Design a protein with these regions (language model features):
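Conserved sequence signature across two-component system core domains
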Residues: 7-8, 32, 50
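Two-component/phosphorelay signaling modules centered on CheY-like receiver
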Residues: 10-30
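Active-site charged/polar residues at nucleotide-handling catalytic sites that mediate phosphoryl
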Residues: 44-45
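C-terminal output helix
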Residues: 98-111
Length: 132
């Protein structure tokens, strides 16, 4: 199951984004304001997407990305100047102010990409040589 976790310092922002995603038919498993809480939610699902801002109460988005399993992607919502130079793998950026249309399209694109990766991993595990 692909879970979506929304992490913003401002609880109202997190709730608003959760509501937008829920109206779009996406399953949001958690809304929180710290990276530690996001890690707790991440432990409850196999893979997912973390939607977050540049800074949480206890860590930066790059630290959270390092702590997340490889099966998780991150959607960073921040002004363009806050993004790193794109060196961190697994992070998609969306510049503020965001439009609902852009948010929904980006999330759908990320979910489809994750589904393709999951199917590919499943197919590879079935085609493994039993002698390995």
């Amino acid at each position: 199951m692909t879970g979506i976790i929304v992490v913003f310092t401002n609880k109202d922002n997190a709730t608003n984004i959760r509501n937008l995603l829920a109206r779009g038919g996406m399953d949001v498993i958690g809304v929180c304001s710290t990276g530690a809480q996001a890690m707790h939610y991440a432990d409850t699902v196999d893979n997912g997407i973390v939607v977050c801002g540049y800074r949480m109460k206890d860590m930066m988005y790059t630290q959270l990305r390092e702590y997340l399993p490889d099966s998780f992607e991150m959607l960073l919502i921040a002004s363009q100047d806050k993004w790193s130079s794109g060196d961190v793998e697994g992070i998609v950026g969306l510049s503020t102010p965001i439009k609902v249309y852009d948010l929904m399209n980006t999330m759908n694109m990320m979910l489809q990409s994750m589904d393709r990766k999951r199917k590919k991993r499943k197919k590879e595990s079935k085609n493994r040589d039993p002698k390995q």
